[in-house]
């Protein structure tokens, strides 16, 4: 990757330094925010290479990266570690402050059917992007109704509903209030003209206190 050389010891050292400080990786040394969504899928925050090695020993075969930043140190190290360990790395970028477009939702559904399990799915904090994807996994792969799947977006996983990241919760709540009473499945709603990500986000209003926490203190992506 441009700017990061993982082929030499010195290059990896420099990449680790960038990862440690620029990606706030020091906060994740002893905290993985790991939770099994099912016996075949675990959600976590951004894993260190040595943590990926530990996960492989536990049977993980696929690593799903939900972050962007493909030129970042975290990505260089994750790619290096997965190649070294023989893990399949899959990139599926999703955001924490936007209503996912139809193609993202349906793409997630298809992703969960084609990957090899057991799998690990992560974003940076393991709270928001991992949360919405866990909701979609629980609904599409496990067959849970949206009401139950929504448990994956909660403070238990450090997700803060009252901030800008609450737009994720709001998206599912709109389905439950607007479409479910009409008998529409979640997929039918997403594929209908009523599913308008721009309008849904415009209708959403973030709470001031939650916004201060997620934007100012936690500095979520």
Regions found by a protein language model. Name each.
Residues 126:
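Substrate/cofactor-recognition hotspot
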Residues 123:
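Short cysteine clusters
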């Amino acid at each position: 990757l441009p700017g990061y050389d993982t082929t030499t010891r010195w290059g990896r050292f420099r990449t680790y330094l960038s990862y440690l400080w620029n990606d706030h990786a020091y906060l994740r040394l002893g905290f993985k925010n790991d939770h099994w969504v099912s016996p075949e899928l675990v959600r976590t925050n951004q894993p260190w290479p040595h943590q990926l090695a530990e996960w492989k020993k536990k049977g993980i075969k696929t690593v799903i990266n939900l972050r962007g930043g493909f030129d970042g140190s975290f990505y260089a190290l994750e790619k290096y570690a997965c190649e070294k360990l023989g893990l399949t790395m899959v990139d599926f970028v999703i955001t924490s402050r936007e209503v996912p477009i139809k193609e993202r939702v349906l793409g997630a559904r298809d992703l969960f059917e084609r990957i090899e399990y057991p799998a690990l799915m992560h974003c940076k904090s393991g709270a928001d992007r991992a949360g919405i994807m866990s909701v979609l996994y629980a609904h599409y792969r496990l067959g849970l109704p949206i009401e139950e799947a929504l448990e994956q977006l909660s403070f238990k996983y450090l997700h803060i509903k009252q901030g800008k990241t609450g737009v994720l919760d709001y998206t599912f709540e709109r389905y439950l209030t607007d479409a479910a009473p009409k008998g529409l499945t979640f997929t039918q709603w997403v594929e209908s003209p009523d599913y308008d990500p721009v309008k849904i986000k415009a209708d959403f209003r973030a709470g001031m206190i939650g916004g201060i926490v997620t934007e100012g203190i936690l500095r979520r992506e």
